[in-house]
């Protein structure tokens, strides 16, 4: 007996399985009817309207109904969906023993102690037939599953079979008066619609139960004479076939098994007995210690039985239904119907290999339990519980599909479990001595090894290793070294599933899944409330497993979820993509197609494959609260926003991710005071003053709103709030606002209107308002309050704000987790001295005078015309900054060149050195040095997407010539070229060839960078651009020695790219004469480039002056603030502070396509901003970003690569190729 579910309750007298759902009804002697979910082990509902014991209960086959009959003489029909009794049928005059629905007609049959059987129409709620004939209690009555028959058992020692075919023939309803007459005759005389067909006599005492065979013309009955009798019937008669003896007390219930040729009976002798219906002998007996059995019920579809006893009920199976199988590569071997079969996953072809020997005993649970397969020898080990545990070894010939001529060679032995451990070796567990016997394919023992723990079962764990299962843990045991390789606490493991690479293992127990690595290092544990049945690993390293009613997944970090709900249990054999191959309980191969997008999505998040995540968001149909909750728990609320439609959920996620814009939109839709309040708190945390103001206005929170205006410097709005408080008669709010404003007159007026004349007098006196104070003193008369003496009076006015603050600058969070970027810092740092800036870093003629002088002259101090300052400075490309002294010219950097001497090396015999260079290397610079320009260009095209090689031609020639030395011999002899190797020495072996010596090195690039920095500082923009481009063109051809230098080269590319972009924009700006707004935009974009601090100060000063001249004061103030944050010199700081003071609180006169609060990059071709979250394409070499329309065109920054081309990346070191 395999117990599936058990309850503890009062005596169970009636049981009924639901035909489709995993439910069972139990009627108790206490009068309660319980409805249980036997899969989950939970009580779903209880019904307790009966008065006294309920002995019969039955589910309807198709409708949401069940019927019950009790000792209160009532039959009740219930609707379990609405949890109520629909109606009650009255008619029986004594206890009702059993009730049952008909499988087709709207009938209920009931048996009662009033010696009658009644058939009811539950739709018309009337009794349609009364079957009389028994002369004692009728203990049970049931319909035939197919024919129009009823069988009944009575304590009058008979079993009767009734013919009810006449009832079915009544297809037309009679008239009402005839119906009433028929009903009267039925009650008095029993009617003629049901007649006795057979009376079966043979029991010596009262018969307690009788039931039909599902398909054969057989009846089985059980009685108080402790016997079970089998009866056969035909069209004319019925007779006794055999008697089964063995029970020691009254037989309570007996039935035929629906799927097996057995009879199940239970008795008051506290036992359940299983009988062979063919041989008519006892097979097995299950006993309880204290509980008598009363009722049996069988599931109409599944192999489940239930038995009710004195203290509850038990749901059980007689035999295991899990097929024995083993997966090997693309094939699964399994046993079905006593045949060994295999199934190919790719072709879905099933082949029957050979029959399996039948067990000699007739007991239950003799089917194969486990199967192990050796692919090299085509050998199969099948283990079962026959004779206390045994195995059979079959060597399957390659061409033996279905033949049995080899069965004489099947080898058998005793053992708890057996498994292959090598190509031609298998291990057998000998439980009695706790050792493993290693046998060969001739079934001969070749080795014995004691086990380190008390082992219940063994499993394969790699060649030469076993996974030994004890009661509370598992260990991996090496049979050769006799060592424990790993141990893990995992109680009651039933199945072990290894991944295809043997790197991970899943240990399945009854209610848990434990994931570990190959050394049994624990990774995660999942606990399930219902039974775990099987599992398999998919190609992504996710474990897919099944429970009784679900297919579920387990990620490497322990996160799990449901993939699909199952109607019946399955056993997974293989997972390929969205296809799950499995075996059902009948041994049939099935293919279940599932949607794996949820766990693939979570796996991509876990492995930080954000590109894959974004692709799935755009293309997949991911939805559901589970995905949203998962993203929220894992810290990705901004991603969860993509899936949410409900506004309240969107609002919560938006607040959590800091996305104020979406939160505002959702709050407008919800329009609830609490949501506006929460929005205000989050907006205040982010410094978004506008949204805080809006939220306070929507909630009419005037006190907070007034204080917000105070701390942000909007004093005019504080005055407006004071007026609103007056209109609302809010004296306290009005007084607070007057305090914020420092308006003493207003405060005196408010206090006087409020009747607080002494306070008004004190306020007026303190602030020197003598006229008002005198008037108030006259009104107060003798009640004038005294003021403290000896204390100097002071004017109590709050400090006036210098400028009104706006929103705090914030990074936008949209898709932020999917965009990575590193801030590059310069390798060659520049001195922090910007006094040498050339005059072309102009402030656009900005002439700022002292503020006090400006006020004295009655102007604003900003009247100088553009181009008026330093016009005499006509230096080409100068910065035009006034009062700036240039430092002395820095020394021209020395050209590093190749420091090593080019020593003549005589060419050795054999392959030319230049050919050896190209065969050994995948570096473009070395191929160019060898003269193999074609392969060098192909390498650069594949690695960096370069298509324009014109700028590289002179560099190729320099590399080739620089890596060779040319020996002039006699005048008539040709010049002899000699390859120059890097690091050559006289002691070097003549057979070892080093790489070519290259004329371009990384230190050279650093020197060129310093020269380009100086040209930039001097304002020689065309010269600086030429030098930066020279560096950018040379980098693909240099070779460095270490990974660290590779990173420095990549860092150098980013630095040069930023300067090239900025200088191109500056030169473009100088070409524009008429478009003033575009000039300001280009100057603003230049400030977004990552520059050295000395250059950033110059760029900010230039942009600040240009915006100020065009009256874009807010933007100019922003640049002034940034300039002050970049440690300017004294003159720059003074100029910036003056601009900040003059622009404070003012707005821009024109709108620019520039938002400094929103992170962006500048398109290298169109010079427009690409804000965070917008689509772009990039250059595969320099990494410059472009709008999508530029894709396929030549990069305007490096002038080499094609924008958007596929490339593998820069390769400039041999260490990248190892």
Swiss-Prot record:
Keyword terms: Cytoplasm, Cytoplasmic vesicle, ER-Golgi transport, Golgi apparatus, Membrane, Protein transport, Repeat, Transport, WD repeat
Subcellular location: Cytoplasm; Golgi apparatus membrane; Cytoplasmic vesicle, COPI-coated vesicle membrane
Keyword Cell membrane: no
Membrane disposition: Peripheral membrane protein
GO MF term set: structural molecule activity
GO biological process, one term: retrograde vesicle-mediated transport, Golgi to endoplasmic reticulum
Compositionally biased intervals (Acidic residues): 862-876
Record region (Disordered): 855-876
Keyword Cytoplasm applies: yes
Gene Ontology CC: one annotated term: COPI vesicle coat
Main location: cytoplasm
Domain of life: Eukaryota
Repeat positions for WD: 7-48, 49-88, 91-132, 133-172, 202-241, 246-285, 288-326, 363-404
Subunit structure, interactors included: Oligomeric complex that consists of at least the alpha, beta, beta', gamma, delta, epsilon and zeta subunits.
Role, per record: The coatomer is a cytosolic protein complex that binds to dilysine motifs and reversibly associates with Golgi non-clathrin-coated vesicles, which further mediate biosynthetic protein transport from the ER, via the Golgi up to the trans Golgi network. Coatomer complex is required for budding from Golgi membranes, and is essential for the retrograde Golgi-to-ER transport of dilysine-tagged proteins.
Cross-referenced PANTHER family: COATOMER, COATOMER SUBUNIT ALPHA
Record protein name field: Coatomer subunit alpha-2
Organism: Oryza sativa subsp. japonica
């Amino acid at each position: 007996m395999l117990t599936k579910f058990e309850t503890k309750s009062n005596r169970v007298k009636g049981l009924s399985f639901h035909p489709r759902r995993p439910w069972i009804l139990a009627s108790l002697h206490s009068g309660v009817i319980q409805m249980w979910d036997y899969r989950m082990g939970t009580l779903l509902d209880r019904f307790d309207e009966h008065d006294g014991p309920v002995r019969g209960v039955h589910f309807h086959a198709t409708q949401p109904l069940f019927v019950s009959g009790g000792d209160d003489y009532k039959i009740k029909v219930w609707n379990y969906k609405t949890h109520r009794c629909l109606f009650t049928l009255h008619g029986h005059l004594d206890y009702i023993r059993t009730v049952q629905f008909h499988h087709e007609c709207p009938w209920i049959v009931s048996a009662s102690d009033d010696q009658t059987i009644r058939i009811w129409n539950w739709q018309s709620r009337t009794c349609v037939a009364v079957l009389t004939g028994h002369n004692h209690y009728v203990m049970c009555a049931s319909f035939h599953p197919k024919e129009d028959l009823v069988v009944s058992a009575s304590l009058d020692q008979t079993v009767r079979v009734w013919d009810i075919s006449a009832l079915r023939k009544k297809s037309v309803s009679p008239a009402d008066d005839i119906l009433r007459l028929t009903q009267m005759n039925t009650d008095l005389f029993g009617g003629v619609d049901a007649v006795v067909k057979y009376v079966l006599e043979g029991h010596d005492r009262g018969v307690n139960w009788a039931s039909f065979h599902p398909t054969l013309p057989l009846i089985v009955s059980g009685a108080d004479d402790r016997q079970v009798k089998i009866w056969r019937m035909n069209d004319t008669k019925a007779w006794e076939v055999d008697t089964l003896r063995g029970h020691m007390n009254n037989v309570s219930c007996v039935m035929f098994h629906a799927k097996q040729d057995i009879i199940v009976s239970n008795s008051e002798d506290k036992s359940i007995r299983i009988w062979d219906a063919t041989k008519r002998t006892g097979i097995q007996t299950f006993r309880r210690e204290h509980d008598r059995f009363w009722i049996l019920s069988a599931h109409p579809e599944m192999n489940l039985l239930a038995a009710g006893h004195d203290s509850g009920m038990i749901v059980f199976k007689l035999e295991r239904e899990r097929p024995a199988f083993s997966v090997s590569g693309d094939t699964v071997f399994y046993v079905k119907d006593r045949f060994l079969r295999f199934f190919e996953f790719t072709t879905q072809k099933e082949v029957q290999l050979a029959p399996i020997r039948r067990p000699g005993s007739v007991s239950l649970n003799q089917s194969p339990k486990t199967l192990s397969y050796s692919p090299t020898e085509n050998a199969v080990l099948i283990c079962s519980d026959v004779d206390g545990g045994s195995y059979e070894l079959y060597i399957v010939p390659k061409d033996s599909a279905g033949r049995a001529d080899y069965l004489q060679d099947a080898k058998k032995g005793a053992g708890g479990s057996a498994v292959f451990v090598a190509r031609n070796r298998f291990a057998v567990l000998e439980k009695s001595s706790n050792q493993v016997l290693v046998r060969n394919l001739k079934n001969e023992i070749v080795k014995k090894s004691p086990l380190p723990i008390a082992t219940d079962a063994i499993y394969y764990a790699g060649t030469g290793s076993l996974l030994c299962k004890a009661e509370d843990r598992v260990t991996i045991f090496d049979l050769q070294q006799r060592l424990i390789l790993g141990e893990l606490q995992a109680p009651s493991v039933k199945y072990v599933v290894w991944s295809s690479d043997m790197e991970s293992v899943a240990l399945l127990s009854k209610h848990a899944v434990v994931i570990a690595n190959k050394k049994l290092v624990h990774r995660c544990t999942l606990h399930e409330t219902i039974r775990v049945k099987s599992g398999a690993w998919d190609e992504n390293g996710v474990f897919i497993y099944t429970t009784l009613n679900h297919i579920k997944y387990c990620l490497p970090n322990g996160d799990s979820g449901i993939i699909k709900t199952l109607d019946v249990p399955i056993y997974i054999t293989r997972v390929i993509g969205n296809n799950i191959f499995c075996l059902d309980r009948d041994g049939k191969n099935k293919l279940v197609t599932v949607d794996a997008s949820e766990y693939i999505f979570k796996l991509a998040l876990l492995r930080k494959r954000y590109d894959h995540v974004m692709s799935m968001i755009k293309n997949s149909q991911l939805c559901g609260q589970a995905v949203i909750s998962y993203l929220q728990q894992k810290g990705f609320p901004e991603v969860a926003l993509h899936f949410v439609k409900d506004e309240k959920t969107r609002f919560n996620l938006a607040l959590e991710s800091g996305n104020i814009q979406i939160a505002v939109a959702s709050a407008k839709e919800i329009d609830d005071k609490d949501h506006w309040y929460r929005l205000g708190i989050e907006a205040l945390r982010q410094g978004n003053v506008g949204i805080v103001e809006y939220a306070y206005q929507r909630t009419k929170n005037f006190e907070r709103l007034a204080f917000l205006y105070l701390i942000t410097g909007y004093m005019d709005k504080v005055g407006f709030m004071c007026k609103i408080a007056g209109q609302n008669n809010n004296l306290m709010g009005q007084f607070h606002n007057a305090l914020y404003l420092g308006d003493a007159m207003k405060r005196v007026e408010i206090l006087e209107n409020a009747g607080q004349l002494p306070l008004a007098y004190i306020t007026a006196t303190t602030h020197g308002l003598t006229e008002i104070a005198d008037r108030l003193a006259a009104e107060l008369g003798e009640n004038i309050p005294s003021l403290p003496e000896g204390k100097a009076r002071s004017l109590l006015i709050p400090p006036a704000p210098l400028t009104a603050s706006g929103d705090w600058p914030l990074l936008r969070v949209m898709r932020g987790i999917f965009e990575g970027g590193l801030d590059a810092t310069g390798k060659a740092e520049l001195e922090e001295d910007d006094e040498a800036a050339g005059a072309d870093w102009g402030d656009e003629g900005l002439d700022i005078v002292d503020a006090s002088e400006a006020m004295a002259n009655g102007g604003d101090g900003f009247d100088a015309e553009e181009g008026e300052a330093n016009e005499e400075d006509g230096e080409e490309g100068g910065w035009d900054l006034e009062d700036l002294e240039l430092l002395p010219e820095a020394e021209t950097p020395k050209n590093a060149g190749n420091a090593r001497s080019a020593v003549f090396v005589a060419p050795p015999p054999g392959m030319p050195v230049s050919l050896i260079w190209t065969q050994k290397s995948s570096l473009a610079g070395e191929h160019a040095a060898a003269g193999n320009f074609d392969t060098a260009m192909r390498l650069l095209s594949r690695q960096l997407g370069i298509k324009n090689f014109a700028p590289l031609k002179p560099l190729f020639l320099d590399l080739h010539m620089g890596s060779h030395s040319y020996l002039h011999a006699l005048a008539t002899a040709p010049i002899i070229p000699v390859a120059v190797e890097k690091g050559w020495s006289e002691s070097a072996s003549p057979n070892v060839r080093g790489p070519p010596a290259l004329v371009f090195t990384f230190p050279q690039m650093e020197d060129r960078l310093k020269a380009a920095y100086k040209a930039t500082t001097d304002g020689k923009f065309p010269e600086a651009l030429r030098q930066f481009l020279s560096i950018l063109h040379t980098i693909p051809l240099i070779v460095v020695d270490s990974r660290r230098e590779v990173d420095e080269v990549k860092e150098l590319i980013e630095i040069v790219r930023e300067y090239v972009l900025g200088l191109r924009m500056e030169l473009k700006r100088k070409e524009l004469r008429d478009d003033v707004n575009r000039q300001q935009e280009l100057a603003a974009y230049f400030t977004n480039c990552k520059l050295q601090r000395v250059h950033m100060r110059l760029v900010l000063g230039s942009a600040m002056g240009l915006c100020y001249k065009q009256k874009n004061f807010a933007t100019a103030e922003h640049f002034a603030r940034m300039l002050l944050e970049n440690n300017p010199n004294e003159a720059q700081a003074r100029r910036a502070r003056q601009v900040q003071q003059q622009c404070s609180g003012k707005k821009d006169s024109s709108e620019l396509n520039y938002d400094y609060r929103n992170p962006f990059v500048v398109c290298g071709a169109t010079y427009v901003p690409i804000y965070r979250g917008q689509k772009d394409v990039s250059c595969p070499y320099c990494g410059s970003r472009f709008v999508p329309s530029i894709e396929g065109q030549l990069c305007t920054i490096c002038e080499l690569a094609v924008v958007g081309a596929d490339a593998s990346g820069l390769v400039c070191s041999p260490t990248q190729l190892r």
